[in-house]
UniProtKB/Swiss-Prot annotation:
Residues that, per the record, bind 5-phospho-alpha-D-ribose 1-diphosphate: 26, 72-73, 99-100, 103, 105, 124-132
Keywords associated with the record: Glycosyltransferase, Magnesium, Pyrimidine biosynthesis, Transferase
Single Gene Ontology BP annotation: 'de novo' UMP biosynthetic process
Cofactor list: Mg(2+)
Organism: Aliivibrio fischeri (strain MJ11) (Vibrio fischeri)
Protein name per Swiss-Prot or TrEMBL: Orotate phosphoribosyltransferase
Gene that this sequence comes from: pyrE
Binding-site positions, orotate: 34-35, 128, 156
InterPro entries xref list: OPRT, Or_phspho_trans_dom, PRibTrfase_dom, PRTase-like
Length: 213
């Protein structure tokens, strides 16, 4: 686990974005942890969040031309990632996001920001069922662009309806790389390093044993 990944987990815990306990997911599964990126909700939080996304992007080595943030949660993520890339990595990338409903006045259309062309890096908070990615792919393909990769905050590394995770299904269906700032494996490593809550650690490990990929 790299330093920025450890710092990200600490940041998420500090802001109560990452919580341990017992949570019922949309899938009906009982999870020992929950991640709610919507709680990164101040200017300072957003600035820090962008730096972690930018660090993961720089670390990945994936070539891309435009950052795309799907509405709604992806919009501030794309914006803050673009700012962090410019400020901390000397990388000035255009960014774009979509409207849920197309405008019929002014500039019109359903895209805001840069043109959606070339190789697209999609940024979002998490991938659960992959539905948002599939909707975004329709927009990307309609503009004649290609999906270079997807960057999310956390990869839960758990099975979907079949044996693959939602992330693995998206990788298979769209032939792209999906990267995350941290994964369930990193989370377990972090808990092992801390060593101050054996109960949390065992609950997360048991969850991985049952639902992990």
């Amino acid at each position: 686990m790299k330093a920025y990944q450890r710092e990200f987990i600490e940041f998420a815990l500090e802001k109560e974005v990452l919580k341990f306990g017992e949570f019922t997911l949309k899938s009906g599964r009982k999870s020992p942890y929950f991640f709610n990126a919507g709680l990164f909700n101040t200017g300072r939080d957003l600035a820090r969040l962008g730096r972690f996304y930018a660090a993961a992007l720089a670390d990945s080595g994936i070539e891309y031309d435009v950052l795309f943030g799907p509405a709604y949660k992806g919009i501030p993520i794309a914006t803050t990632t673009a700012v962090a890339l410019a400020d901390h990595h000397d990388t000035d990338k255009p960014y774009c996001f979509n409207r849920k409903e197309a405008k019929d006045h002014g500039e019109g259309g359903n895209l805001v920001g840069s043109a959606l062309e070339g190789r697209i890096m999609l940024v979002d908070d998490v991938i659960t069922a992959g539905t948002a990615i599939r909707e975004s792919m329709e927009i990307i393909q309609a503009n004649g662009a290609d999906l270079a990769g997807v960057l999310v905050a956390i990869d839960r590394q758990e099975k979907g309806k079949g044996e693959l995770s939602a992330i693995q299904e998206v990788e298979r269906d769209f032939n792209c790389s999906i990267i995350s700032i941290v994964s369930l494996t990193d989370l377990i490593s972090f808990l092992e390093e801390k060593g101050d809550n054996a109960e949390q650690l065992e609950a997360v490990k048991a969850y991985r044993a049952e639902f992990g990929i």
